[in-house]
Amino acid sequence: MSTPLYFPATSSPLYRLDDETDAMALTDQMSARLAQLQALLAMTYGDAGDAFRRMAQSHRDDYLWACYMIAGEVRELGDALLVQRRKEAGLNA
């Protein structure tokens, strides 16, 4: 598959998916990253958000940057999953 993954901190591919990566592996990775993102974001609002709001501005920026990067990775994994599903269905990617 060799789908390049671009992360917000780099301008070139940092990782490439293995040619043997199947739709299930992509789905599992997406699910894991979404669960992590949900947990991170749960700490930014409501009563739990008090600790977040007390963080230094630079820490809040880095925290939200991590959330942003995870969201970008999930988007890229979704794109790769679409390509993989088309490939498995015998359609042109």
What does each model-found stretch correspond to?
Residues 1-93:
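Sequence/structural signature of long amphipathic alpha-helices
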